[in-house]
């Protein structure tokens, strides 16, 4: 069994999401061969040298899962693209490049965060290219912590404001980009997150059937894609209210 999740946006202000994730680690993930986290794992990440006590607790929880035998793979999202080798080493996980092709159930599957598919949002794509440049990353990682915190808040607020103003089709994936990149990597299954629009889309690429599986964000409920001998199953689950969790 292999599990894939994305867009948890973990932060101390959302203990319900944190509890649901920790429950997943202590339960179903212990029985899994691998856990893939496809970006926006944290709501914000300003550097491995600036881990808060909350983020450190998540790191330790991942390490416990890794030590139990489950392999963990982590991909950058647009909120946590500064996650580095230091965190991954401490958490016992492997950093995946975006995009990556992996074998799931004997089938090559393309994994992405999904933001690079939104090519109609030209302003965002330009900003993404700038922020992911090695020189920009080097500069960001060497800024004072206070400056990084302020910059992260500014970028997050601007991102939220711009997303609210943009048309839905602009912030969703570009339809023509999906078959193009699937053909480029020679796959018939694509799994990604980012858009917060969970679904399984059936496609036709040439004369072959294909599918695009969109993982859901963890806001009002959690989403998990489970891959096993039964196939690919995308499902959601409700969070346990924090008041109940505290009593157990």
UniProtKB/Swiss-Prot annotation:
Topology in the lipid bilayer: Peripheral membrane protein
Residue numbers binding substrate: 78-79, 121, 159, 163, 166, 194
Binding site for Mn(2+) 1: 7, 9, 40, 196
Enzyme Commission code(s) on record: 3.6.1.54
UniProt feature coiled coil, ranges: none
Alphabetized UniProt keyword annotations: Cell inner membrane, Cell membrane, Hydrolase, Lipid A biosynthesis, Lipid biosynthesis, Lipid metabolism, Manganese, Membrane, Metal-binding
Domain of life: Bacteria
Known catalytic reactions: UDP-2-N,3-O-bis[(3R)-3-hydroxytetradecanoyl]-alpha-D-glucosamine + H2O = 2-N,3-O-bis[(3R)-3-hydroxytetradecanoyl]-alpha-D-glucosaminyl 1-phosphate + UMP + 2 H(+)
Cofactor binding remark: Binds 2 Mn(2+) ions per subunit in a binuclear metal center.
GO biological process, one term: lipid A biosynthetic process
Matches recorded under SUPFAM superfamilies: Metallo-dependent phosphatases
Pathway(s) it belongs to: Glycolipid biosynthesis; lipid IV(A) biosynthesis; lipid IV(A) from (3R)-3-hydroxytetradecanoyl-[acyl-carrier-protein] and UDP-N-acetyl-alpha-D-glucosamine: step 4/6
Disulfide bonds, paired cysteine numbers: none
Subcellular location: Cell inner membrane
GO cellular component assignments: cytoplasm; extrinsic component of plasma membrane
Amino-acid positions noted as binding Mn(2+) 2 in the UniProt annotation, renumbered to this chain: 40, 78, 113, 194
MF (Gene Ontology): manganese ion binding; UDP-2,3-diacylglucosamine hydrolase activity
Cofactor: Mn(2+)
Sequence similarity: Belongs to the LpxH family.
HAMAP family in the cross-refs: LpxH
NCBIfam families with a match to the protein in the record: lipid_A_lpxH, PRK05340.1
Function: Hydrolyzes the pyrophosphate bond of UDP-2,3-diacylglucosamine to yield 2,3-diacylglucosamine 1-phosphate (lipid X) and UMP by catalyzing the attack of water at the alpha-P atom. Involved in the biosynthesis of lipid A, a phosphorylated glycolipid that anchors the lipopolysaccharide to the outer membrane of the cell.
Record's protein name: UDP-2,3-diacylglucosamine hydrolase
Organism per entry: Pseudomonas syringae pv. syringae (strain B728a)
